[in-house]
Every structure is written in C-alpha cells, then in structure tokens.
C-alpha cells in the first residue's frame, strides 16, 4: 500500500526534464515521459521495450499504423489503450490498426493524407505571409518554420510560434488565418510509424511493405522480429531460423532465415537498421533517431525474444538474451544510412563481431525452441544447428565485405 502511494504520486507529479540531455541518447530519452504504459503484454515482452522508446523520442508527434498481431493486441485491446498523452501538452500518439494484412499500405495512406493537408495549409499560409498586410512577426515566423519544415524535432517550436502569429492575425480580423487554424494540428511535421511483427513483414504483408518502402515516401517501419508468428501460437515464418522447432516445423525448420534487411538495402535509398536493445542501447537509440530524421523510407528490425522461445530462467532474462544473441553472432547489428554518401561517409556501419561458435551453440541450447529438437531428434539437431551456425558465419562474412564495398 505504501509503494502504491509513492507510485501514484510519481505518475501524477513527476514531470519530464527537457533539455537536460539530447533526446537521441540513452540517458536523454529516458528523461522523456513514455507514452506507452501498462500495455498488458506478456511479462518481459521485448516488443513493448522498442515501442515505448519510440514514444519517448517522438510520441507527441506520432501517427502509428499497426499490423494485426501481438503488437495490435497489447497496443489496442478493446475498451482501453496503453498509448497515452503527455501530461504537459495533452498530445500523444494517434494509433490505428487495419485487421486485414495491408498495414504498410494503411500506414502510407496515413502519411499521404496528412502530408496533403499540410502542404495545402503551408501554401495558404505562404499567401498570407506574402501579403502586404502580414506583420513582420508573422513573416519571420513563417520563414523560420519553412527552414525546419522537414525536420520533426526542429519544426516543433517554429510551428508553435507560427500558430501563435496566425492566432494574432485571426484576432485582428484575418478570416483566412481563422480558417487555417481550424486544422492547426496538421501544421507541425509529424512522425509516421508502421509497426508490425515478422509474420506480417517477412510473410503475409511483404508485398505491401516492399511497395511502401519503394515509394520513397518519408515513413518509418518498425519490425518486431520474434522469428515466428507469436500471436497465433508460434508458427514458422520466413524469419524463423534453421533448426527452430515451432508449428509447421515440428522437426526443426530446414531452410535459413530470410534477410529482409538486405532486400531493403538493395534499393539504395532506404534507411535500414538491425538493432537489439538489450545488446547495445546506444546503437538502438541512434538508429531509431537517424531513421526518423532520414528524409525517406526507413526500416528498423529489432530482435525480440518471445515467451514462446522458452528462454531458460523466463522472460526476466529477455534483454540479456538479446545481448547473448549479439555476442554469439546469432543477431547482427548494423545500419545503412544513404544520407552518409553525400557527406563522403560509408553508408554501411557494422557494429557486431564475428560468430563465436561456443557461445552460438550455448545460445541455441538456452532456448526451448531449439533444445527440444535435441531431445527429440539428437542427430538431426546436431546437423541443423551446425548449418545454422555456418549460415551465420557466411552472413557475417558477407556483411563484412559490404563494409568494404560501400567505402
């Protein structure tokens, strides 16, 4: 009871601490209010860790289109919403979900809709600012707004200043300013996110995802990669790995995991990142911030250990399991930022180390989704696990060559 009182006081009274540290750092992001809370996901769920972090970075300006799956269940169970508003501004993520597997297209529609409204508003404001009757303050506010128009973070304060000047103009009798203010929530730059799991991104929604990424529009895709269809009970997906035991692969999956990240990289103009929050928080925060700032499509794939993996010790070890996966070479951390080319920098950054065979096999043995194959078919398990490790070695060598090729 005493702890509940302390918790209630903190929720009601502890405010965010802006400007103490940069938002795009681990420590700075954690001074911002999470706009995802009390989600009802499985205890230790990795997906909510990623979503929570993104809301701390961009939550007040976020539009979220969510694929149907685990993230739509903990993200929007009927009658409640774990997404909340900032208690200072009253703003928070606008969340929606399409039941049909067209989430990428749905998210693109959200982006294009608000983009069209915003561009029309900017055109109308430009006409007001360019007239002889416009005040010097309104002209200056509009110039500053236009200078930051395409930067979500930098555009926030200029947008508020511009709205304040439009309100003054409306109060002075400008009817056009008054009309524009009816849609003032569209003036500031928004951050549009498309959330979904690997079943959606790698499999049944891949066609739409590919279409949206290829469009070149400024949308951000966050894939929670659990390496299986988690929400429906653990079926194999194209993200499942060799030797993994799950539904439709009861004797262990025989083919290797699809490399969604590298497929996206072939376009050359898509920001791509693979992250694992528990393994390298700095890399994860930096990648998310860079992806959002990139003026084009971005794809972030986050490793997300699931309750169905059967991690020894339970999901209290979720974040540590991410660290083990990266240290073993099971999961690679990297970013591909096309914007670096214009600055003479290498667009591809590989943060991971090579495969450690001993740690790799220990990781597989630490998860029931693999160890159950050893109990049922020991010889088959030995063969498939060796292939799993070899594919990981080949993939790391390939990624290492990409570092040199992109120089």
Language-model features and meaning:
Residues 100-176:
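N-terminal leader/propeptide and maturation segments of large enzyme subunits in energy/redox metabolism
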Residues 4-5, 14, 74-75, 84, ...:
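Thiamine diphosphate
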